[in-house]
A protein has these predicted regions:
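N-terminal helix-cap/turn-to-beta initiation motif at the start of protein domains
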Residues: 1-8, 105-108
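Low-complexity, Gly/Pro
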Residues: 1, 29, 54-57, 103
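Short, surface-exposed beta-strand-loop junctions and turns on beta-sheet-rich folds
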Residues: 43-46, 66-67, 92-96
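Short, compact, well-ordered microdomains
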Residues: 71-107
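Mid-chain, well-packed structural core segment of small domains
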Residues: 51-83
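Short beta-strand segments that buttress and anchor functional surface loops
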Residues: 36-41, 59-66, 87-90
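N-terminal glycine/threonine-rich, aromatic-flanked beta-hairpin/loop signature
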Residues: 6-9, 17-55
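General beta-strand recognition
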Residues: 8, 37, 57-59, 84-86, ...
Length: 110
């Protein structure tokens, strides 16, 4: 299984249960060329300089906004034996937040 694609963040133990989906459904997206994006709570970030999405684990750098403040940091993610994703988003010189995610399944209205 590849990391490439969109993952729905289902749990972030460091926050109250409803915080990750405060503004939109929490997610992390890994694309080709080491890019991607994520959103949880009031934080949005652009992923750049990521290692290969073809592996089962990835490390990345990111920059974005949290409550309208500029933030940046690093992150890691790894596919678990059950096919879920476990990772951590770290703020530079600051907090580290663990997350758990499942592959995003899209549904199209009929």
């Amino acid at each position: 299984m590849s990391l490439k694609g969109k993952w729905r963040i289902t749990r972030m133990p460091d926050f109250l249960a409803d915080y990750p989906d405060m503004l939109e459904p929490a997610y992390i997206l890994f694309e080709d060329e080491g890019s991607g994006e994520f959103a949880f709570g009031c934080c949005t970030g652009q992923i750049w300089e990521a290692s290969s999405t073809e592996a089962t684990s990835i490390s990345f750098s990111w920059s974005g906004c949290d409550e309208m403040d500029q933030v940046e940091g690093q992150g890691i993610a790894e596919i678990q034996p059950d096919g879920s994703l476990q990772g951590e988003i770290e703020y530079q010189h600051g907090d580290e937040f663990e997350f758990f995610a499942e592959k995003w399944t899209s549904s199209t209205a009929c």
